Amino acid sequence: MICWSCEKNAGDGMLCSGCGAVQPPDRLADHFRVFGLPRRFDLDIADLERCYKEMTKVLHPDRFARADGRARRASLERSVQLNLAWRTLSQPVARAEYLLSLESMEAGAPVGSTPSDEAGNRATRPVDTALLVEVMELREALSEARVRGDVAKVAALVAGVQANHDKEMAEVAAGFAAQRPNLAAIGARLVAARYYRRFLEEAEASSQGEEDPT
C-alpha cells in the first residue's frame, strides 16, 4: 500500500511505516485481521481488549483535531472498522457466528446463513422445533414463577438456562477446535445458544423492571 501522505510504501499496519500517517482501512480485512489475530474462536479476551484500547488511543479524535481532511477521514474510517471488530470479537456468540460465516464462505457452503445484524455476523438458520417448544415453556415457567413471587424458582430457571447456554458454547468451541470443523453442527449449537442467551437477557430485563418500576 502506498501512503497517501509521503507517497512511499506504507507497509501493512495502521500507520505508515515511514511517516507515521494513519492509513485508510483495508476494506477486505476481516475482524481478526484488524487486530492482527489468527482466524480462530479461542481468543485471549484480555489481550484483545488491551490491543483495542491501544489502537483507540492512536485513533483518538483529539489527535486529529488540526489534521488535514484526509488524515481525519482515515482515522474516522479506522475507528469505525476497529469498533465493529471489537464488538464482534469480544462477544463469544457474535464471534462464533462471524467466524462461522467466514469459514462457510471459504468452504463454499453458506450453511443456510444470511448476515443480518450490524456486524454482518448473525445467521438465519432453521430452528429445531423441540428447542422452540423448550424455550416457550421456559418463558411460561419464568412468568408464572414471577407472578407467584417464587424467587427460588426464578433463580433455578435462570441457572438452568445459563448452564445450557454454557454447554452449547463449549460445544461450539470444541467444534471450531476440531481438525475438520462440522460447520452445520456448529451452526445448530449457535442457534440454541442465541435462544438461551435471549431468554437470559429477557429474564434480566424483567428482573430490573420489577426492582425499578419507574
Whereabouts are the PLM-identified features?
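C-terminal accessory/regulatory regions appended to core domains
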Residues: 1-214
